[in-house]
């Protein structure tokens, strides 16, 4: 029997709309001088995909929906799989600089994927000679994945399957030994409908089990919070990022040297790279909203995804993820105190999850029938018009560590790697923390109507890092934003 989407996978499928395409992504810049003859043909990249694609089963599967969404769809092999549809070749418009590349990536990322095909697509992008700091002749590779098929770690597994730790050159010509896709293991309609009834009963039994454990679970949470002095996460204040999103996106990415990150961690014992990244985003949001005269008195709230994926799950696709909803202390004036507060909050929140387990809300997601999820997805699509409340967080901060050694695509050496998130109505800013070689990267995707000036937020991120670095080394600093004025949160309409 074909594998079925999980409830979490289905959530991302049902909420995919023109304004909220549920796609995450990566892009890298590559130096072809290490490839055979110092040049990479597009067909070399196609050949690389062709010889590696079977390592990632999710890359050649598509969804088969159950009539009327009575149950979650099934994954079936795409017998008409067309690699040249999924891997495309384009050129960056002149002047071919970093700004143009970010604009192009934002536009490509804003387009929904075709849900009738395997849920990913990539672009090889030439014409990057106007980008400072990279060798001439470089090309970029951008790839996006639907979150129903790949979470952040599964997407990273796909990306790594295409790469090597040394220059490896594709052998043979693209299409020379093209495999015939195996016959799709398609379930019949009667079988799917029958299973939908069985699955519904299982979900109701699971819901009853979770309900029976609700009071003990809540008691454990209260006991843990009281023991560790951890306050209940407050409601988020409303900001410009917590309104309906348009289909338009802006994107940018910044790099920071690992050497400076290590100095900060050495100066503040116990601080993790994730703590530092959350603090940088906190400080940057504080600065950005202050310039708009919209900085709330209350701390902003962030959703930080937590991967539950095990080593044996590599290449399997799908979603195995939970999340923490935490204050990021944007109401603290001093950057060093912000870092310490973030470290304290993240440490206790992670400890609570390990000791108490996932929240009731996370557990209940697995009990919601597909018909209800599908209806909720349609409701989310019209939510901007009917004034539905936004989600529980102001922004998302996702940490997906990357390789510390050189990686090669079709023999070309990667010189940069960056991640790209997704937006939802009510959460119009997504920050991704990643790493490659000797750099830590913070990239962000935002709704263009909510952030018409991404260069201002980009500058705020860089200034935030510099302030934290200076503060941790000197132990003191005079922040440029000294006070928080009366809260000017965005009003709900």
Predicted regions and their residues:
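Active-site regions of oxyanion-processing enzymes, predominantly non-cytosolic
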Residues: 42
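Soluble acyl-CoA-dependent acyltransferase catalytic core bearing the H(X)4D motif
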Residues: 1-8, 27-38, 46-427, 431-462, ...
């Amino acid at each position: 029997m074909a594998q079925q989407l999980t409830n979490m996978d289905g959530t991302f499928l049902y909420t995919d709309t023109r304004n909220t395409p549920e796609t995450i992504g990566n892009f890298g810049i590559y130096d072809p001088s290490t490839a055979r003859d110092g040049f990479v043909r597009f067909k070399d990249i196609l050949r690389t995909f062709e010889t590696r694609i079977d390592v990632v089963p999710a890359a050649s599967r598509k969804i088969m929906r159950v009539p009327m969404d009575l149950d979650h769809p099934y994954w079936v092999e795409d017998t008409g799989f067309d690699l040249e549809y999924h891997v495309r070749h384009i050129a960056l418009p002149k002047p071919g600089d970093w700004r143009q590349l970010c604009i192009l990536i934002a536009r490509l990322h804003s387009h929904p994927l075709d849900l009738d095909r395997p849920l990913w697509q990539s672009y090889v992008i030439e014409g990057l000679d106007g980008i400072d700091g990279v060798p001439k002749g470089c090309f970029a590779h951008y790839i996006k994945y639907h979150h129903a098929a790949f979470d952040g770690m599964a997407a990273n597994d796909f990306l790594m399957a295409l790469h090597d730790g040394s220059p490896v050159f594709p052998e043979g010509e693209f299409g020379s030994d093209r495999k015939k896709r195996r016959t799709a293991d398609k379930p019949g309609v009667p079988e799917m409908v029958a299973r939908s009834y069985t699955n519904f009963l299982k979900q109701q039994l699971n819901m009853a089990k979770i309900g029976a454990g609700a009071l003990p679970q809540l008691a454990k949470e209260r006991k843990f919070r009281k023991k560790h002095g951890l306050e209940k996460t407050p409601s988020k204040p409303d900001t410009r990022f917590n309104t309906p999103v348009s289909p338009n996106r802006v994107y940018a990415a910044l790099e920071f040297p690992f050497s400076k990150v290590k100095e900060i961690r050495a100066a503040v014992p116990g601080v993790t790279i994730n703590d530092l990244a959350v603090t940088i985003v906190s400080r940057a949001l504080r600065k950005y909203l202050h310039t708009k005269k919209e900085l709330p008195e209350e701390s902003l709230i962030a959703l930080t995804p937590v991967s539950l994926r095990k080593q044996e799950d590599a290449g399997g696709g799908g979603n195995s993820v939970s999340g923490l909803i935490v204050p990021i202390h944007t109401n603290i004036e001093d950057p060093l105190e912000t870092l310490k507060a973030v470290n304290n909050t993240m440490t206790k929140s992670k400890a609570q999850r390990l000791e108490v387990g996932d929240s009731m809300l996370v557990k209940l997601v697995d009990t919601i029938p597909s018909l209800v999820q599908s209806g909720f997805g349609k409701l989310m699509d019209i939510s901007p018009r009917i004034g539905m409340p936004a989600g529980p967080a102001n922004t998302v901060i996702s940490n997906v560590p990357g390789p510390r050694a050189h990686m090669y695509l079709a023999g070309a050496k990667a010189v940069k790697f960056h991640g790209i998130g997704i937006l939802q109505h009510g959460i119009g800013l997504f920050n991704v923390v990643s790493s490659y070689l000797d750099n830590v990267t913070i990239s962000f995707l935002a709704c263009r109507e909510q952030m018409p000036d991404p260069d201002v937020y980009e500058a705020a991120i860089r200034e935030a890092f510099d302030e934290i670095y200076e503060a941790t080394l000197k132990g003191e600093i005079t922040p440029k934003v000294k006070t928080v004025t009366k809260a000017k949160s965005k009003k709900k309409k």
